[in-house]
């Protein structure tokens, strides 16, 4: 697992249905750590470019439909709740996700 991977997750709470998510924690984080920071994805796209990153499906990312990374809803989940790897975001999508995450947590102020 590495940053930018698109995986399936089953997180708890309001967004608990299995869905694609992007690994957003650094690759420098120990692989033995019990949890992983992800941003879940949704196919219900909204007009919120500051914190929702729209990603079109490609063979590389493994998505089936246009989706948005919900940078406004990062979650930490137990490693065992991560399912299979679907694909990986391209460099442009990762760069846009970085900007959105910086906006959400106030690093862009």
What are these regions (language model features)?
Residues 1-109:
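Conserved functional hotspots at enzyme active or ligand-binding sites that engage polyanionic ligands
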